[in-house]
Amino acid sequence: MKITSVKAYQVDLPYVGGTYYWGKGNAIRVAPTTVMVVETDAGLSGCGESCPIGGNYLAAYPEGVIPALARLAPAVIGQDPRHIHRIERLMDEALTGHPYAKTAIDAAC
């Protein structure tokens, strides 16, 4: 089995409680999320997601997920998604850091 494509979809997920608050008066009503779909030549697909909520909470921004995935996708296409340690190594070689983007592919595999 080999990965044939990596697709990303952006969606704003509303908080069930209305507003999410954290330190320094920060609040958001939706979580900007990227849903990742990894497709294989066996007709199987896997899904993962990345939902960073900004630099006041984590060192990650939702706007950075798609560009990071553009660097990561070519590294994993053609690979067997069941060999997750190899996938992780290839992602690390393709892009330093950005675990918030790598986790979506990791979960999808």
Q: Predicted segment positions?
A:
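Structured beta-strand/loop patches that form or line metal/cofactor-binding pockets in enzymes
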Residues: 1-47, 51-56
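Metal- or metallocofactor-binding catalytic centers and their adjacent structured scaffolds
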Residues: 5, 39-109
